[in-house]
């Protein structure tokens, strides 16, 4: 798995609500969240499939 899969979810400081997914390391699964459109980190994916491919293996 990529190193950034261990990063905590970061919504960012902006006001948008962009449906996204992040990998929750302790739960070993990809979960949905609303990205704000700016800021955040690399633990953010457009689809659950992309999240699983990158972080689950």
From Swiss-Prot:
Outcome after substituting residue 26 to A: Important decrease in binding affinity for Kv
Residue numbers marked as site, Important for binding to potassium channels: 3-4, 6, 8, 10, 26
Tissue specificity of this protein: Expressed by the venom gland.
Consequence the record notes for mutating residue 31 to A: Slight decrease in binding affinity for Kv
Consequence of substituting residue 3 to A: Important decrease in binding affinity for Kv.so
Keyword Cell membrane (UniProt): no
Similarity annotation: Belongs to the venom Kunitz-type family.
Residues marked May be important for binding to potassium channels (site): 7
One GO CC term, this protein: extracellular space
Outcome of swapping residue 44 to A: Important decrease in binding affinity for Kv
SMART domains the record matches: KU
Gene3D superfamilies: Pancreatic trypsin inhibitor Kunitz domain
Outcome following mutation: residue 9 to A: Slight increase in binding affinity for Kv
Outcome when changing residue 10 to A: Important decrease in binding affinity for Kv
Effect annotated for changing residue 16 to A: Increase in binding affinity for Kv
Phenotype when changing residue 53 to A: Decrease in binding affinity for Kv
Outcome recorded upon mutating residue 52 to A: Slight decrease in binding affinity for Kv
Main localization (coarse): secreted
Disulfide bonds: 5-55, 14-38, 30-51
Name this polypeptide is given: Kunitz-type serine protease inhibitor homolog delta-dendrotoxin
Effect of residue 28 to A: Decrease in binding affinity for Kv
């Amino acid at each position: 798995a990529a190193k950034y899969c261990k990063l905590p979810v970061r919504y960012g400081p902006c006001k948008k609500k962009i449906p996204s997914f992040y990998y929750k390391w302790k739960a070993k699964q990809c979960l949905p969240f609303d990205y704000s459109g700016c800021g955040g980190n690399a633990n953010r994916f457009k689809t659950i499939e992309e999240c699983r491919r990158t972080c689950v293996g």
